[in-house]
């Protein structure tokens, strides 16, 4: 490890010791941050996998039910049923700070004003069968789970990026900056000891 190109003086020695103290403290803080990010990241990955598996099953089952319900209806009637949507959804995103990582928080709100006027669904109960009503209701209920999945996946991506950045900073301090400072401090201490011994020898020669 190449030492720093500085003059071997007591002032430089003091400055380097302060830098080493700061680097050591920063290294510990960054390691703690990395470890906590990793812990939360693992929890989110587990939630992401479980949520994705659950959603894939529920969406597939719901789509199958919808296809079966649609098969018992006239195709033209089905098109008319969904021709004029009345279910409006407002989506907004807040930002949450997790260990200095800004991650999205999705919120959804249904605008039910028109639904209350025209009924819960975008069609008349009299015009459709109960199976189709159930599948549409389940689809609406799955929306929040889909948003949560998107939120978790984006959070995992952002946290993974920050974990990698933090890991590089920790390694830079641990394997480069701190050893370089320690070696330079050791070098200056040796030089100062040599200078002190040489000065002592000169004094002894003068007094003798």
Curated annotation (Swiss-Prot):
GO molecular function per UniProt:
ATP binding; proton-transporting ATP synthase activity, rotational mechanism; proton-transporting ATPase activity, rotational mechanism
Q: Which GO terms describe its biological process?
A: proton motive force-driven plasma membrane ATP synthesis
Q: Which Pfam families match?
A: ATP-synt_D
Query: What is the native source organism of this protein?
Result: Streptococcus pyogenes serotype M6 (strain ATCC BAA-946 / MGAS10394)
Does the UniProt entry include the keyword Ion transport?
Answer: yes
Q: Which InterPro entries match?
A: V_ATPase_D (IPR002699)
Give the range the annotation lists for the signal sequence.
none
Q: Which family does it belong to?
A: Belongs to the V-ATPase D subunit family.
- Quote the protein name from its UniProt record: V-type ATP synthase subunit D
Disulphide-bonded residues: none
Q: Which UniProt keywords apply?
A: ATP synthesis, Hydrogen ion transport, Ion transport, Transport
Function description: Produces ATP from ADP in the presence of a proton gradient across the membrane.
């Amino acid at each position: 490890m190449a030492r720093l190109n500085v003059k071997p003086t007591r002032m430089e020695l003091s400055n380097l010791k302060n830098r080493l103290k700061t680097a050591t403290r920063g290294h510990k803080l960054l390691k703690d941050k990395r470890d906590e990010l990793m812990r939360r990241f693992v929890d989110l990955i587990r939630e992401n996998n479980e949520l994705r598996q659950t959603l894939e099953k529920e969406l597939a089952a719901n789509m199958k039910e919808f296809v079966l319900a649609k098969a018992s209806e006239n195709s033209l009637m089905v098109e008319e049923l969904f021709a004029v949507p009345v279910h409006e959804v407002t989506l907004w995103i807040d930002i949450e700070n997790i260990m200095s990582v800004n991650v999205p928080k999705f919120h959804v709100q249904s605008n039910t004003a028109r639904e209350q006027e025209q009924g819960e669904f975008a069609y008349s109960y009299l015009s459709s069968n109960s199976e189709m009503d159930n599948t549409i209701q389940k689809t609406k209920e799955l929306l929040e789970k889909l948003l949560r999945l998107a939120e978790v996946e984006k959070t995992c991506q952002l946290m993974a990026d920050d974990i990698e950045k933090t890991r590089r900073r920790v390694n830079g301090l641990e394997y480069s900056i701190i050893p370089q400072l320690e070696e330079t401090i050791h070098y200056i201490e040796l030089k100062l000891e040599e200078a002190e011994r040489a000065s002592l020898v000169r004094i002894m020669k003068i007094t003798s």
